[in-house]
């Protein structure tokens, strides 16, 4: 990554929705309305069974297909799990890690860290999700809580690998609720995240890393 230039990235996922057939139809339509030019990267992260259909549909476009989760192990007796090398071979470029819905099912900061390192070893770009609950926000400890998640997620990662990652700030209280953080709230937390990245990896790497906001986004509030 050119650390003197931070290219915009737009990423989305549709959770446990759409069959492979529906994915193909959606992607075919999306190609007709996708942003033109090269001012940003676009990532679409889909359920595992939809990855082949998405990759085929987006072949010869600049849209990167990703997965919504992976296992930290390279192989083994982990029934139902998917390894980073499998996702890479299937055509993925990105993987979402630490989404609040995964954390709600017991995924820990340590789990997220193991997955981050597995993906970087497998040449995939992690999209590392962090965010606070409404209780944490009401306590006034949002920045400390989120920065602790960032620090834990990147433990043992060096600056060169960190520069390949994307951080997604997703306040839990704004996911699927119709509520969104104000621009000021989002900017404050994203600034705190970047400051924490600077502590971990230095100012140059921190400024190069891309930070997203997610939570009840729609065409009416994206700007």
Predicted regions, residues:
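Active-site loop-to-helix "anion-binding N-cap" substructures in soluble metabolic enzymes
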Residues: 1-223
């Amino acid at each position: 990554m050119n650390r003197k230039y931070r290219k915009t990235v737009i990423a989305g996922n549709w959770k446990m929705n759409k069959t492979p057939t529906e994915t193909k139809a959606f992607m075919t339509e999306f190609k007709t309305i996708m942003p033109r030019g090269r001012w940003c990267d676009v990532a679409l992260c889909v359920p595992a069974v939809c990855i082949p259909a998405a990759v085929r549909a987006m072949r010869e476009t600049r849209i990167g297909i990703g997965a919504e989760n992976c296992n930290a192990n390279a192989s083994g007796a982990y029934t139902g799990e998917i390894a980073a090398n499998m996702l890479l071979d299937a055509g993925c470029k990105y993987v979402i890690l630490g989404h609040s819905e995964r954390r709600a099912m017991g995924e820990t900061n340590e789990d997220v860290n193991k997955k981050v390192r597995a993906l970087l070893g497998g040449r995939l770009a992690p999209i590392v999700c962090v965010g606070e609950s409404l209780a944490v926000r009401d306590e006034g400890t949002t920045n400390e809580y989120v920065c602790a998640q960032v620090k834990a997620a990147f433990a043992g990662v060096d600056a060169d690998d960190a520069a390949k990652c994307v951080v997604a700030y997703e306040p839990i209280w704004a996911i699927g609720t119709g509520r969104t953080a104000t621009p000021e709230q989002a900017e404050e937390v994203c600034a705190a995240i970047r400051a924490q990245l600077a502590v971990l990896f230095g100012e140059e790497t921190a400024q190069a890393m891309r930070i997203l906001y997610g939570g009840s986004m729609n065409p009416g509030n994206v700007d």
